[in-house]
From Swiss-Prot:
InterPro entries membership: RTA1 (IPR007568)
Primary location group: membrane
Membrane-topology annotation of the record: Multi-pass membrane protein
Keyword list, A-Z: Membrane, Transmembrane, Transmembrane helix
Transmembrane segments: 14-34, 40-60, 72-92, 115-135, 156-176, 206-223, 238-258
Protein name: Uncharacterized protein C17G6.02c
Origin superkingdom: Eukaryota
One biological process term in Gene Ontology: phospholipid translocation
GO MF: ATP hydrolysis activity; ATPase-coupled intramembrane lipid transporter activity
Amino acid sequence: MYYDNAFGYIPAHWVTILAVILFSIAFILHVACLAFTRKWLVIVPIIGTIGELAGWACRLDASYNPDDYNAFLGQIIALIIAPVFYSAQAYVLFHHIVLLYGPRFSVLSPKLYGGIFITFDIIALILQAAGGGVAGGADSGSQLQTQGSQIMLGGICFQLFTIVVFSILFSIFFIALYTHHPIRPSTGRREPDVPYTRVRTMSCNCLALATFAMVVRSVYRVIELAQGWEGAVITHEVWFDIFDFIPMIFTSALLIPSLYPALERSKLPFTEKHVSSMEYAPSEYGPSEYGPSINDITNMSAVIYPDSFLAPKDPKKSFSSEEL
């Protein structure tokens, strides 16, 4: 049923309450993860979840006060900005996955994923925030509102383009990895050969699902804004709940187990600098096409971290794949 307010409907109480509860739980889990891991990258999805929580709090207020224009404006800005932090987290996590499994399977250098895609995310964020502010502060049906909507649409289209390109590169990497067909030629330097485990596979699958959810949400937002403020999509709450709320709560939850490769990589006895600049001696079993053996990594640890627990006291002892 159409309602003559900024939304075009009255937000459902139960949906907004459910969203606030679920994003509150997600926020608590992300904060707990930060306290447990003490890794700065966990802060990024926390900011995104705070944004989602703020946006749905505004929608909850609007469910009781449907004519409150400030609530409408607040939810527009918050729910447009928040997903940018989720996508930024995905780019950073993929950077760590590439370093963990081998840059030779990636189209781009690992450091470029964060640099290029986060820069694009910032551009999309600025466009969407600026457009949302202009459109939200303008009179309904005015030319200024139309201009603001067009700016927002440009920002969300750019964000969709960015995440689709990222998804393609993401897919290419894992296809090359699982088929053992390196994309980039070997430079002669050795890279870590990390075996697959159920936990590693689950973590990568969670990141893939989170990325897909963000693509779905972006496609919906493009269609919504392309139709305008009085279009059939934006004035029907059910589409917003299905294609924005559900993808974003799943994304927030899925980014938690997706942290595993980044946390695991920090335990390996070498850093990105060592991977990119050091030559490693082959193991007693000879060189491997896909990277060093466990003995190679053990030998590296003794050189790089001679005083750490990673360097075995017995030179004949090597690490098992589970210890890595």
